[in-house]
Amino acid sequence: MSTNSESNARTMIGKVVSDKMDKTIVVMIERTVKHPKYGKIMKRRTKLHAHDENQVCRVGNTVKIRESRPLSKTKSWVLVEVIS
């Protein structure tokens, strides 16, 4: 049952911008969107808090995170792997 819910969970790839909290990292996700009227391609950024159990991430690392149940008020993502 848990494998089915894990396969449906969203995953994102982003860059670590903060690792100052215990077992928590802040990951910036950057995406491009097209303006609906003018058609200009714009960058949009989202910061997500993710759980880093073993505290292996450092600022500047590229990581993959997966959506999970809420772990705190702002944290509902879990670190899957460090890409670089």
UniProtKB/Swiss-Prot annotation:
<dbReference type="InterPro" id="IPR000266">
    <property type="entry name" value="Ribosomal_uS17"/>
</dbReference>
<dbReference type="GO" id="GO:0022627">
    <property type="term" value="C:cytosolic small ribosomal subunit"/>
</dbReference>
<dbReference type="InterPro" id="IPR012340">
    <property type="entry name" value="NA-bd_OB-fold"/>
</dbReference>
<dbReference type="Pfam" id="PF00366">
    <property type="entry name" value="Ribosomal_S17"/>
</dbReference>
<dbReference type="InterPro" id="IPR019984">
    <property type="entry name" value="Ribosomal_uS17_bact/chlr"/>
</dbReference>
<comment type="function">
    <text>One of the primary rRNA binding proteins, it binds specifically to the 5'-end of 16S ribosomal RNA.</text>
</comment>
<keyword id="KW-0694">RNA-binding</keyword>
<dbReference type="GO" id="GO:0019843">
    <property type="term" value="F:rRNA binding"/>
</dbReference>
<comment type="subunit">
    <text>Part of the 30S ribosomal subunit.</text>
</comment>
<dbReference type="GO" id="GO:0006412">
    <property type="term" value="P:translation"/>
</dbReference>
<comment type="similarity">
    <text>Belongs to the universal ribosomal protein uS17 family.</text>
</comment>
<keyword id="KW-0687">Ribonucleoprotein</keyword>
<dbReference type="GO" id="GO:0003735">
    <property type="term" value="F:structural constituent of ribosome"/>
</dbReference>
<protein>
    <recommendedName>
        <fullName>Small ribosomal subunit protein uS17</fullName>
    </recommendedName>
</protein>
<keyword id="KW-0699">rRNA-binding</keyword>
<keyword id="KW-0689">Ribosomal protein</keyword>
